[in-house]
Amino acid sequence: MEVINVSKHYGHSIILKDINFALNKGEIVGLVGRNGVGKSTLMKILVQNNQPTSGNIISSDNVGYLIEEPKLFLSKTGLENLKYLSNLYGVDYNQERFGSLIQELDLTQYINKKVKTYSLGTKQKLALLLTLVTEPDMLILDEPTNGLDIESSQIVLAVLKNLALHENVGILISSHKLEDIEEICERVLFLENGLLTFQKVGKDSHNCLFEIAFSSATDRDIFISKQEFGDIVQEEGLRITMSGNIQSSELFKFFNENSIKVIDFETKKETLKDIYLNRSK
C-alpha cells in the first residue's frame, strides 16, 4: 500500500496535509497521535470509506478493516457471524484456517454462544477474526486491543505477528496502548498537526535519555549553547533531560574539555512513551 500526497480538508479545517508513506507486505506499522488529530480519518481513507481532498492511495483490493467500535450481530453466535460474512463476501468458509484462528484467539469456548453474552474483550477478538474472512493482504486496525486485559492483548498481538510473519500480511495499527505498539511494530508514524513524522521503533533503534544536573547555571548554559549531541526535551532549574543516540563517555569527555561541572547524571533507554510525550509538548 502506498499513500501519496494525501490531504483532507473539512471546510477551512485541514485534518491531513500531504501524507506520504508505504505499508509493505509482512510489515507491522504503528500509528499514534493525540485524540482528534485525524488517525481514524486517515484509516477510513486507506480503506476507501472516505475520500481524500487530494492525493492518491495505491492499494490491493483485499484490505481488512477493524473499526474502533465494531458492529456485530449480537443475537447470532460468533460462528454464525463468521459464516454470514463469508457468504456475504462470496468466499468459502475455510474450516481448517478459521478453526486454527479461533483457537489462537482463545475463542473456542465462545464461538457457539450468542455474541450478546460476550465480554467487550471477547467481542473485540471476534471482530478481529471477522476482518480475516477474505484472507486480506493488508490489515488496517483501529484500536485492536481495545477492552482487552493484558493476557488477551498478548494473544491478539501474537496472532498479528503470525499473520505478518507467516502470511506476509501488511498491518497498520492505531492504538493508545503505546506498549503494544512498541512491542509489535517495526515503525511508528506520529500524526501531529495534520502531518506525519517517522520514528524507528525497537530496542536497538531508540535513543537514550540523559538526565543531567549541573553545579551552576553557567555550567548548564555552556552545555546547552555548545552541545550538538541531541535534543533538550526538558529543562528545570539546573537539571536538563536530553535525548540522543550517543555514549555516556562522549558526554563526559565534553564536560571535561569544557570544564563543565556535573553533580548528577542518569541515563536510561528512551521508550515510545517518552518519544510520544516529548513530541506532544
Located regions from the model:
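The feature captures the beta-strand-to-loop junction immediately N-terminal to the Walker
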Residues: V32-R34
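Short, charged/small-residue-rich alpha-helical element at the C-terminal edge
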Residues: F210-R279
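Conserved ABC ATPase "signature" region
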Residues: K83, N87, Y93-Y110
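Helix-to-loop junction immediately C-terminal to a conserved catalytic motif
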Residues: V47
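Catalytic Walker B motif of ABC-type/P-loop ATPase nucleotide-binding domains
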Residues: L139-E143
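Conserved structural motif at the start of ABC-family nucleotide-binding domains
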Residues: M1-V3, L16
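ABC transporter nucleotide-binding domain
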Residues: L157-T241
